[in-house]
Amino acid sequence: SFDELQKRIIDLPYDGNNYDSDEVVKLNKVSIRYGDRTILNELDWTVHRGEKWALSGENGAGKSTLLSLVCADNPQSYACDISLFGRKRGTGESIWEIKKHIGYVSPEMHRAYLKNLPAIEIVASGLHDSIGLYKRPQPEQMAVCEWWMDIFGIADLKDKPFLQLSSGEQRLALLARAFVKDPELLILDEPLHGLDTYNRRRVKKVIEAFCKRKDKTMIMVTHYESE
């Protein structure tokens, strides 16, 4: 049952976050322009540890741009006044030091992942933030991947090549990938996109349970108020 599912997530051990800042994201007068289009204009935004944010707005309103800044994926982020986990960008931290705290999924990512690896290896790539695996996962890491695949109802697909999964199953695998390192900051860009009614309910329950845990921070982009 979904109640049992939620309990399993809420009961996960709390490993303590390894960054010591109350501010997870801080943008100070951030502007992003592409050519003569201004996507973000002098935006101030602070996300504190444990907060849950929903971003909604039209396509092209800058939501994905905002997420790419937070994920440290945007090439313009170095020029902007942005701090992540209490550390200002461009003060010597590597992108991997930032990413180790972040779990992320988006529809764009789905298009980038056309790799014919077994589904569990796609999930495992979330442990190291690589699209292809650089390191073979250890057995205990594989067990964690299987645990999250089970949470999303796809444990029986772990050895199936990713490209042979249905589109909805691929989405669930990429969601499992976002959760697999039990991140401090979870960034979900339209997490229910492309799912059927049953799996939308399931994923909502997983997200709700994750959000009940101590100090977990979430930013979710949605097109729909109802989500």
Residue locations for each model-derived region?
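Pre-NBD coupling/linker segments of ABC/ABC-like ATPases
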Residues: 1-31, 102, 133-139
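Conserved structural motif at the start of ABC-family nucleotide-binding domains
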Residues: 25, 40-42
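Helix-to-loop junction immediately C-terminal to a conserved catalytic motif
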Residues: 71-72
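Conserved ABC ATPase "signature" region
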Residues: 124, 139-157
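Conserved ABC ATPase signature
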Residues: 137, 161-165, 169
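Hydrophobic anchor residue at the start of the ABC signature
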Residues: 175-176
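Catalytic Walker B motif of ABC-type/P-loop ATPase nucleotide-binding domains
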Residues: 186-190
